[in-house]
């Protein structure tokens, strides 16, 4: 999913049947719950935070951590164990002619196929392992040809453009053994979301900001596994397994240190946490937020909160870029270049820079803008400006949480 990190934590799935059981005695300084023993958190709030007419369905979701003993700091992430769409599982079992109550062994535990495909295995994205398995069962010449060494590029494209359901539907086979089918699947992995809250402001809660991944493939609407679950099926009071993933490389400096925060879309989530924390602590350090989205009217995430922080000076400055509101697309890096002199002055004062969001576009564009700003204001060569920015990274004054 977009706006998420993925973890290879099969152990979360292993813990699902006993999620509500506490672990044995632990050292005093360790939480009771972890990624191997996730806490079952109830959903306190799940609301859309975009306006009517938005092309997105960005949501603010609040989880209760009450009784968990879990703690986090701004910059950390929440690992969430989502489940597959029941409609996809039902269609897959129908195509396979496998009974939903057929029982299989999964790491020593007896599960029905419905349980296993819903909670334990990835049934959306096709992998090379699944393609290998299905090709062995199928008589389809097209699949056999894709396995040839000189077709590696085509095979990669095929896997990117075909889900497991697409392959099963397009290349039907005879009888499928339930135990054999799951050997071609990978474990369902939890997803990581930047925490959008501070315990200093909302004790025993963790908030996240999620934009569900939605797209069309082969004429059918598709959704991301976790983001689709959270947006479409996670109702109030529902419970999901969660854990805290610490992020020591993306955290606030001292209270008096200036901070520059740059994010687009859901990448603004940790900066909400930063400002909640600074407000609660009465921090005096200056703060500057650059925020980008598509439309001012519909997509200004957490608008009233930023305005309140500007009013009480928890947030010193804010620049916004709404890319689809004008004749030309304007992004956060363009706003940065409009504030070249002030940005460089903040850097010279010791400001820390934080970037959160898309790794493919936002991160490199902001990085290039920083180098251009330093080169222009310091009247230095591009190489010298790059050295300056590299020094910021080495001093942990330029931190990125990108995905």
Regions found by a protein language model. Name each.
Residues 1-403:
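FNR-like FAD-binding dehydrogenase module
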């Amino acid at each position: 999913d977009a706006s998420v990190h993925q973890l290879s934590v099969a152990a979360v799935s292993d813990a699902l049947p006993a999620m509500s059981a506490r672990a044995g005695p632990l050292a005093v300084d360790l939480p009771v719950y972890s990624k191997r023993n996730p806490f079952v958190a109830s959903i306190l709030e799940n609301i859309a935070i975009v306006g009517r007419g938005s092309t997105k369905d960005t949501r603010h979701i609040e989880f209760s951590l009450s009784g968990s003993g879990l703690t986090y700091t701004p910059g950390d992430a929440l690992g969430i164990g989502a489940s597959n769409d029941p409609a996809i599982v039902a269609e897959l079992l129908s195509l396979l002619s496998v009974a939903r109550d057929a029982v299989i062994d999964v790491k020593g535990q007896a599960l029905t196929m419905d349980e296993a495909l819903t909670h334990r295995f990835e049934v959306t994205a096709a992998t090379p392992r699944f393609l290998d398995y299905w090709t062995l069962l199928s008589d389809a010449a097209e699949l056999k040809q894709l396995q040839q060494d000189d077709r590696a590029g085509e095979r990669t494209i095929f896997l990117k453009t075909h889900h497991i359901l697409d392959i099963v539907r397009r290349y039907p086979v005879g009888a499928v053994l339930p135990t054999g089918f799951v050997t071609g699947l990978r474990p369902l992995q939890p997803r990581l979301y930047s925490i959008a809250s501070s315990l200093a402001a909302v004790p025993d809660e963790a908030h996240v900001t999620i934009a569900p991944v939605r797209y069309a493939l082969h004429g059918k609407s598709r959704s991301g596994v976790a983001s689709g679950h959270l947006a479409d099926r996670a109702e109030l009071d529902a419970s999901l397994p969660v854990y805290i993933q610490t992020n020591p490389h993306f955290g606030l400096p001292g209270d008096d240190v200036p901070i520059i925060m740059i994010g687009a879309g859901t990448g603004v989530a940790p900066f909400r946490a930063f400002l909640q924390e600074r407000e609660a602590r009465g921090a005096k350090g200056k703060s500057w937020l650059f925020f980008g989205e598509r439309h001012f009217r519909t997509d200004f995430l957490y608008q009233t909160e930023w305005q309140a922080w500007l009013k009480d000076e928890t947030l010193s400055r804010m620049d916004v870029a709404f890319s689809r509101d004008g004749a030309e697309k304007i992004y956060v890096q363009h706003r940065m270049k409009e504030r070249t002199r002030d940005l460089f002055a903040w850097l010279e004062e010791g400001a820390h820079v934080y970037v959160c969001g898309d790794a493919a576009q936002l991160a490199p564009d902001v990085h290039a803008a920083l180098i251009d700003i330093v080169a222009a204001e310091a009247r230095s060569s591009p190489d010298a400006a790059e050295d300056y920015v590299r020094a910021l990274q080495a001093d942990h004054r330029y931190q990125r949480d990108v995905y």
